[in-house]
């Protein structure tokens, strides 16, 4: 079984996989370790996610959705007035998740035996967690589990260090 880990961040997001031995971080098409959690829709209706969306948002903020993770678990819509479009925070997050999943090699994406873990802030309430699960479902990720960010950090440190000890993780 293969595992995929996703940091669905407020500002930036990232994706990696674990094959049982090694963790692989997948870069964006621009060769960045992280992808901006941004969506941009141009006047023709073309949708962009990531760096191009983030860079375009600076010039045309009314065509862009950024910082939508802060709205997860609420009924507050994400408005893109320049293109007369309203999206839910879940729809925005699903776009980012689909984009990240597209960075994976086909043998991982097409594997029906891939489990996905998405990290969420420790302060996320149940509505925000449910909203994140809805976004993952809308993105077609299949089997998904959520893990609080500090827990994921401790697990990463424990995997890298084989000796006993006390580890403190600050988030």
Name each model-derived stretch.
Residues 1-36, 41-170:
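N-terminal phosphate-binding loop and flanking beta/alpha elements of the actin-like ATPase fold
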């Amino acid at each position: 079984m293969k595992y995929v880990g996703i940091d669905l961040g407020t500002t930036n997001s990232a994706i990696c996989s674990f094959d049982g031995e090694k963790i692989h971080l997948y870069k964006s098409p621009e060769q960045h370790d992280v992808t901006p959690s941004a969506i941009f829709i141009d006047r023709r209706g073309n949708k962009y996610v990531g760096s191009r969306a983030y860079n375009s948002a600076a010039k045309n903020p009314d065509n862009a959705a950024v910082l939508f993770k802060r709205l997860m678990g609420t009924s507050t819509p994400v408005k893109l007035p320049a293109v007369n479009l309203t999206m839910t925070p879940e729809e925005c997050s699903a776009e980012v998740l689909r984009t990240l999943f597209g960075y994976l090699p086909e043998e991982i994406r097409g594997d029906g035996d891939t489990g996905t873990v998405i990290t969420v802030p420790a302060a996320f309430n149940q509505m925000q967690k449910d909203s994140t699960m809805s976004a993952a479902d809308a993105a077609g990720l299949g089997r998904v589990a959520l893990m609080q960010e500090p827990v994921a950090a401790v697990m990463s440190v424990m995997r890298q260090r084989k000796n006993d000890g006390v580890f403190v993780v600050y988030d």
